């Protein structure tokens, strides 16, 4: 039995310097684990088995480190893994103590944000955007009054324009002229003056009578 175990383990111990596939390594390791009690009885076979296990573990560790380093190199994360060198250590951990700046040297002052008015396309500060939008669109109290006044003025002007146009059209249909209108107006004015003068004369006569 010992000779058979020796024949099985001797090739494994002799070829420790060669490269085995993963399946072969797992098979050899399982064989050593199964025959562990028998290997203890033979010191030579035990040394060969221990050397083989050590070499297999070393190959696995080296291969893992190599694959991880290759991956970091390809992805560009190798510099982050290396860290900062000793010559740049002081500058890397420099703390900024200037006013209005944080420890990293970034400004802490709040920048004023500007908003674009959708009605007039002007840049307005964010704090004044709401009142500006009310005034610009006529939605505030004062703005609504001004807008209603403007609307009433426009309606009045349009009404006067329409009445003037209808008056001109009606005057043209009756066939009257400006001269005839002036004559009628002057005659009416004379009649009013004559009636007023007669009334004044009558009142003066009545005041002069004695009873």
UniProtKB/Swiss-Prot annotation:
Annotated region described as Disordered, given as residue ranges: 149-211
Zinc finger map (SGF11-type): 115-136
Purpose of the protein: Component of the transcription regulatory histone acetylation (HAT) complex SAGA, a multiprotein complex that activates transcription by remodeling chromatin and mediating histone acetylation and deubiquitination. Within the SAGA complex, participates in a subcomplex that specifically deubiquitinates histone H2B. The SAGA complex is recruited to specific gene promoters by activators, where it is required for transcription. Required for nuclear receptor-mediated transactivation. Binds independently on SAGA to promoters in an RNA-dependent manner.
Cellular compartment(s): Nucleus, Nucleoplasm; Cytoplasm
Positions carrying Phosphoserine: 187
Domain of life of the source: Eukaryota
Quaternary structure (record): Component of some SAGA transcription coactivator-HAT complexes, at least composed of Ada2b, not/nonstop, Pcaf/Gcn5, Sgf11 and Spt3. Within the SAGA complex, Sgf11, e(y)2, and not/nonstop form an additional subcomplex of SAGA called the DUB module (deubiquitination module). Interacts directly with not/nonstop. Interacts with the AMEX complex component xmas-2. Interacts with Cbp80; important for promoter recruitment of Sgf11 that is not associated with the DUB module.
Stored Pfam families: Sgf11
Keyword Zinc tagged: yes
InterPro entries documented for this protein: SAGA_su_Sgf11, SGF11
GO molecular function terms attached to this record: transcription coactivator activity; zinc ion binding
Entry protein name: SAGA-associated factor 11 homolog 1
Presence of the UniProt keyword Nucleotide-binding in the record: no
UniProt source species: Drosophila grimshawi (Hawaiian fruit fly)
A GO BP entry: protein transport
Similarity annotation: Belongs to the SGF11 family.
Alphabetical list of Gene3D superfamilies matching this protein: Classic Zinc Finger
Domain remark in the UniProt entry: The long N-terminal helix forms part of the 'assembly lobe' of the SAGA deubiquitination module.
Keywords: Activator, Chromatin regulator, Cytoplasm, Metal-binding, mRNA transport, Nucleus, Phosphoprotein, Protein transport, Transcription, Transcription regulation, Translocation, Transport, Zinc, Zinc-finger
GO CC, alphabetical: cytoplasm; DUBm complex; nuclear pore; nucleoplasm; SAGA complex
PANTHER family according to UniProt: ATAXIN-7-LIKE PROTEIN 3
